[in-house]
């Protein structure tokens, strides 16, 4: 009754590679829970549980924190488990508490660092959930000292760099004593470089404080990093005339070059890591 259609009478040969299921292993912390692609969704019994799960999700990116520091941040989140901070988006509270706690220990993140390690916070475009708005809300709810996160104080940003290149044998949480000279030197260079830009009227006043700080810190970091790679390659030295009171610890930078490179590479992956050629050329004049 029915005649076969020649064009649809096709044959296909599909070859599958050999797969031995017995040899496959699950990923660490892998579970069968459902994670929505449109929003972060955690199975939880309470808001406290949800915050802790969220904190674990975010802190794994801060690879340079040791177990004591991570435990300390969890205890800080646990201390406010009965506080209702936001009616919605409770998950996002945990990383903000972590950032404010780390800031209280003298370490802050520039906009590029925030994008590298907390892209969800950086890419939030809602006015209600923008970074500065959330910082203000959490400071008010938890009784933290009120103030802007980004201020013209460069030491805290370089303290985060110091955390990332710490020696494995450092003692105490957020301890950067061995790297303190590097923090002082980079900060002095940035302060003097910032004043040079002010005198030359090169600072973009329409930009936010965070954007200006981000540009200054990124320029200094990439310039020092590239000079360091040259001296390692040529087995030479370099100095910066802007570092008057605290000379750059070249030996320390050479010893920690692998860690420094890893940190810089994380920053380079971000969209906000943009260096002005004019600023970089101006800064290079002070390096010999």
Curated annotation (Swiss-Prot):
Any single GO BP term: DNA-templated viral transcription
InterPro entries, per the entry: Pox_A8
Pfam families for this protein: Pox_A8 (PF04745)
Ranges in coiled-coil conformation: none
Keywords (A to Z) from UniProt: Activator, Early protein, Transcription, Transcription regulation
Induction, per UniProt: Expressed in the early phase of the viral replicative cycle.
Keyword Calcium set for record: no
Family note: Belongs to the orthopoxvirus OPG134 family.
Subunit structure, as described in the record: Heterodimer of a 45 kDa (A23R) and a 32 kDa (A8R) subunit to form the virus intermediate transcription factor (VITF)-3.
Function recorded in the entry: Acts with RNA polymerase to initiate transcription from intermediate gene promoters.
Protein name: Intermediate transcription factor 3 small subunit
């Amino acid at each position: 009754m029915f005649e076969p259609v020649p064009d649809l009478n096709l044959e296909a040969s599909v070859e599958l590679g050999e797969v031995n299921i017995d040899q496959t292993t699950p990923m660490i912390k892998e579970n069968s829970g459902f994670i929505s692609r449109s929003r972060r969704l955690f199975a939880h019994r309470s808001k406290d549980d949800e915050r802790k799960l969220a904190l674990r999700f975010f802190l794994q990116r801060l690879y340079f924190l040791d177990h004591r520091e991570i435990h300390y941040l969890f205890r800080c989140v646990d201390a406010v488990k009965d506080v209702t901070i936001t009616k919605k988006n409770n998950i996002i509270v945990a990383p903000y508490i972590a950032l404010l706690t780390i800031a209280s220990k003298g370490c802050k993140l520039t906009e590029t660092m925030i994008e590298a390690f907390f892209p969800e916070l950086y890419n939030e475009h809602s006015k209600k959930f923008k970074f500065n708005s959330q910082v203000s809300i959490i400071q008010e709810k938890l009784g933290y000292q009120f103030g802007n996160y980004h201020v013209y104080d460069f030491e805290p940003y370089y303290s985060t760099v110091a955390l990332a290149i710490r020696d494995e044998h450092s003692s105490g949480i957020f301890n950067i004593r061995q790297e303190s000279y590097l923090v002082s030197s980079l900060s002095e260079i940035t302060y003097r470089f910032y004043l040079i830009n002010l005198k030359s009227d090169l600072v973009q006043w329409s930009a936010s404080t965070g954007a200006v700080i981000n540009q200054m810190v990124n320029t200094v970091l990439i310039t020092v990093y590239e000079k360091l790679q040259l001296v390692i390659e040529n087995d030479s030295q370099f100095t910066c005339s802007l570092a008057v009171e605290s000379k750059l610890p070249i030996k320390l930078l050479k010893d920690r070059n692998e860690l420094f490179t890893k940190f810089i590479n994380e920053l380079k992956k971000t969209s906000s890591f943009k260096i002005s050629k004019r600023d970089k050329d101006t800064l290079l004049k002070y390096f010999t």
